[in-house]
Regions:
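C-terminal catalytic lobe of FAD-dependent flavoproteins
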Residues: 2-6, 10-53, 59-239, 243, ...
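Intrinsic disorder at enzyme termini
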Residues: 179-188, 195-198, 230, 253-324
Length: 324
């Protein structure tokens, strides 16, 4: 909406609805459990590979630069979830996550994210005198492909290409590079491979060193720039119970041993990765999770001093709050 305003377009009106969900340590149920009532906080439990997701909240927000889960939101989700599935009272949660739903808002409509439409609209802006600008807004994950198709067709027509988009019938090409993101694949791969020297670097998700090597090799010419966050996006590293507390150090050490890293950049990558994971861990820090967090802090800060590691320009990383 801000970008459309910069171009002089005032017809795009969005409602920003922040949603928070929490992730369990283990799978609670193999089917979706939805509470039969009007949509509200904590009314759906969804299986996601080896974990379950409990959500979600809905809060209208204005500032998109300060989006993070809060303890109050987590407490509310747990309380509502217990009423639906009593087992949740004894479930360990390892992470909270927040995102923003950009919902279409009709002029004069009530600013309630629960009531707003999940549909999408494609604006060509020609009525506003713009022939080189388009906006696709609204929608949800299940409609993203269709949104891209309609937008692609519009842009293609403007460029003189009348051939329709085929993403609805032609599958995207697959490849081995994405296999490491599948829950359980790395463990099956490691067991089948039977290589004693192939060390497990992430014990929670059983990601072996060979998987890290394969991921790095898929970035030819940019191996030294492959951060831990980039590796985590392409694998299950940091997704387990420890949330990167131990595997971050093992993966970094392995990359130093392989001479992929040969400067303090690897340490800064480790620091940034741990800090990013901590943002989602802090709101669910209670019970048996606390001793593990204390151990991680002692390891990362007291022993290794990652929180005091300066950037290239000598700037110290921010401290306090949720951004170590």
């Amino acid at each position: 909406m801000r970008v459309a305003r910069l171009a002089g377009c005032t017809g795009v009106n969005l409602l920003y609805s922040k949603g928070t969900l929490i992730i369990s340590n283990a799978l609670i149920g193999r089917r979706v459990i939805n509470r039969l009532r009007r949509p509200g906080d904590g009314d759906i439990l969804v299986p996601g590979g080896t974990v379950s997701l409990l959500g979600t909240t809905s809060q209208t927000v204005q500032n998109l630069d300060e989006i993070h889960p809060t303890v109050a939101e987590v407490d509310r989700l747990v309380a509502e979830g217990i009423a639906m599935v009593p087992q949740i009272a004894h479930t360990r949660f390892i992470r909270a996550f927040s995102g923003v739903r950009p919902l279409l808002m009709a002029a004069g409509a009530d600013a309630d994210g629960r009531k707003a439409s999940r549909g999408f609209s494609l604006f060509d802006h020609q009525s506003e005198g713009l022939a080189n600008f388009a906006t696709v807004a609204g929608g949800k994950l299940t409609t993203f492909r269709l949104m891209a198709e309609k937008t692609g067709d519009l842009v293609a027509r403007r460029l003189g290409n009348s051939e329709p988009c085929k993403s609805g019938t032609a599958p995207l090409p697959s490849g081995d590079a994405i296999r490491w993101t599948e829950p359980g694949f790395a463990a099956r791969y490691w067991v089948a491979r039977r290589q004693p020297g192939d060390l497990i670097l992430c014990e929670c998700e059983m990601v072996p060193a060979s998987a890290i090597d394969a991921i790095v090799e898929n970035a030819p010419g940019a191996q030294s720039q492959m951060s831990l966050n980039a590796i985590a996006v392409r694998s299950r590293v940091g997704k387990g119970t420890c949330q990167g507390a131990f595997c971050s150090l093992r993966v970094s050490s392995h990359l130093y041993d392989r001479q992929v890293y040969d400067s303090p950049l690897g340490l800064r990558n480790t620091r940034d990765f741990v800090a990013q994971r901590f943002k989602g861990v802090a709101p669910v820090a209670w019970g048996e999770h606390l001793p593990q967090l204390e151990l991680a802090e002692a390891l990362h800060c007291a022993l290794l001093g990652l929180d005091q590691l300066a950037d290239d320009g000598g700037r110290q990383p921010p401290t306090g709050g949720q951004d170590p």
